[in-house]
């Protein structure tokens, strides 16, 4: 596995790319590049605009891909140093961990374009975020011999597609019933049910609505039949018991006025929910950026 560490220092980025086994080395090379973060912010906004054109079906096919590659190429050119670019392009390793400061989470690193492909298509890519928040060491869960998976689908009973998604996942895993135990719950899912059963499972898949509270972000969370399963609820649970190893949250910020569109600050909104799970002991979090 490759690890790309990137630190923000004023108007520059300092970075180092190394194999995970090299963590114990006494010395490690790093390189630095000056960055105009005003320009980077504009490019990030352009990425969101392009993705929203897909959702609104304004632009499709090759025109959109061409525009996205241009923006991705500019991000690649302006964010990474030459040594890092060269090693990424020549590496035969397929797994890449991106370790970044939380100030850099709004950048769509996965869409950096190296001239031939996007970073997320070249690597199995994951993020590790460094935070200034003081956190206690969470209780990490070990995988059971036969992992248990909970599917929570359409808890508010107004998303047929979320229900069908849950059914499809259950049916797919049904073929492997000797290897993984699946429980499926749909409609009328309340907060008490989730709090009681969430920590019994190794994997949780949620398909439904999520609401973001800009005034009190700790109240943001999954929308259930009787309210939100919030960031605060997650943090409270994580202080007493081990949470699932993997949470797949196929939910995004519900907005009736502009359904299907992506907010300019979508990375930050997703980070609030993701960080709550990760701080509480969830090892892996997958989340959607598109409104549902």
Residue ranges and their predicted role:
Residues 1-207, 214-216:
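Domain-scale, conserved, charged regions that form catalytic cores
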Residues 123-147, 155-157, 203-292:
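Catalytic cores of nucleophile-dependent amide-cleaving enzymes
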């Amino acid at each position: 596995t490759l690890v790309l560490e990137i630190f923000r220092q004023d108007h520059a980025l300092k970075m180092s790319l190394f194999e995970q086994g090299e963590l114990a080395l006494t010395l490690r090379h790093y390189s630095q590049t000056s960055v105009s973060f005003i320009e980077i912010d504009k490019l990030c906004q352009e990425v969101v605009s392009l993705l929203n054109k897909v959702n609104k079906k304004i632009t499709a096919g090759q025109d959109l891909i061409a525009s996205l590659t241009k923006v991705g190429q500019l991000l690649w050119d302006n964010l990474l140093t030459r040594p890092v670019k060269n090693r990424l392009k020549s590496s035969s390793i397929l797994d890449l961990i991106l370790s970044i400061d939380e100030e850099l989470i709004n950048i769509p690193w996965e869409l950096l374009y190296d001239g031939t492909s996007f970073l997320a298509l070249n690597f199995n890519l994951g993020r590790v975020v460094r935070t200034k928040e003081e956190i206690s060491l969470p209780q990490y869960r070990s995988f059971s011999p036969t992992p248990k998976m909970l599917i929570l689908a359409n808890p508010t009973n107004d998303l047929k597609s979320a229900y069908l998604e849950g059914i499809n996942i259950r049916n797919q895993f049904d073929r492997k019933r000797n290897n993984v135990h699946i429980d499926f719950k749909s409609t009328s899912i309340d907060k008490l049910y989730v709090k009681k059963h969430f920590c019994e499972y190794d994997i949780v898949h949620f398909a439904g609505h999520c609401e973001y509270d800009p005034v009190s972000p700790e109240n943001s969370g999954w929308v259930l039949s009787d309210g939100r399963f919030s960031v605060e609820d997650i943090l409270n649970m994580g202080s007493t018991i081990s949470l699932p190893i993997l949470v797949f949250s196929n939910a995004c910020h519900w907005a009736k006025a502009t359904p299907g569109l992506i907010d300019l600050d979508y990375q930050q909104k997703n980070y609030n929910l993701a960080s709550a799970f990760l701080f509480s002991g969830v090892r892996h979090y997958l989340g959607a950026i598109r409104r549902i």
